[in-house]
């Protein structure tokens, strides 16, 4: 097992990564006092697989546990689900000392985290991510949010969990399409910060898809360590943390325009990463050879390289100008400058963006 610490002074917390963690009371009792009231919030897909394991473990130190099951899908990461959680907590008369366990993928983690931030001005919560994407990205760093019809993650808060518990055995029940979507975020870390990790992924992709224990623990740990280091330097995304959004400006536009859930987040990020790399090449920031290597690794990970053919330049620009990185009306893009480095760039012309969009459509 690996343990990584997110260093945020009094709000620091551990990330535990390994197998069979749900059955080990130590991972929960270290952050949940005995006899505590706990609410496990999951979805209708994940709860039947893993909720009872966690409830049984919590019962070993006499916690009073209740379970809420949400609908499954990006389309439910909305105000209605947020309100459903708050109503459940109120109807059960939970006070500020309740602990909430977010058991599921990125949607569950985001909406449950946001509800935890808001309920009685903030209650403790633990992230228990069950998809590769949530294990390597969304569960770490305290970003919580719900979607708005006009934009993804537009309503939310920075609110850190008390712990992140990552059991790689969950990946055995994850559909391959969802696993591939998570690989988009894994590959992102290699592109923006760590060229050695990029090379390692290129050499070990088959092991990852075979769910090799050591390969998974290493890849997830490396991603979490990179993100923990970045978050410790820039929790509220005023600087270096923005680099973690490689591919997301284009990708969020795809998700919003095509309808949440039709493209998985990682699929949209993959296509968006290609668009960012092509933009960087047109701006003279990266070589065509490195763009080709990025595309080849995404393809090896069974990810889409092209944006939807039905999306117009106007549709892309409409959504991209609502991106949270826009400042003073100017679009800022995270662009790779080589494999292993990246920067935030302002001032890419609409003509270049239009060329990129047309070039990168299916």
Swiss-Prot record:
Keywords: Amino-acid biosynthesis, Aromatic amino acid biosynthesis, Cobalt, Cytoplasm, Lyase, Metal-binding, NAD, Nucleotide-binding, Zinc. Zn(2+) binds at residues 185, 248, 265. Its main location: cytoplasm. It is an enzyme of class 4 (lyase). It comes from the Bacteria. NAD(+) binds at residues 72-77, 106-110, 130-131, 143, 152, 170-173. GO terms for cellular component: cytoplasm. Its cofactor is Co(2+); Zn(2+); NAD(+). It catalyses: 7-phospho-2-dehydro-3-deoxy-D-arabino-heptonate = 3-dehydroquinate + phosphate. Pathway: Metabolic intermediate biosynthesis; chorismate biosynthesis; chorismate from D-erythrose 4-phosphate and phosphoenolpyruvate: step 2/7. GO terms for biological process: amino acid biosynthetic process; aromatic amino acid family biosynthetic process; chorismate biosynthetic process. Binds 1 divalent metal cation per subunit. Can use either Co(2+) or Zn(2+). The keyword tRNA-binding does not apply. One of its GO terms (molecular function) is 3-dehydroquinate synthase activity. It holds the Pfam family DHQS_C. CDD domains: DHQS. It is found in: Cytoplasm. Its EC number is 4.2.3.4. Disulfide bonds: none annotated. Belongs to the sugar phosphate cyclases superfamily. Dehydroquinate synthase family. HAMAP family: DHQ_synthase. Catalyzes the conversion of 3-deoxy-D-arabino-heptulosonate 7-phosphate (DAHP) to dehydroquinate (DHQ). NCBIfam families: aroB. This is 3-dehydroquinate synthase. It comes from Aliivibrio salmonicida (strain LFI1238). The lineage of its organism: Bacteria, Pseudomonadati, Pseudomonadota, Gammaproteobacteria, Vibrionales.
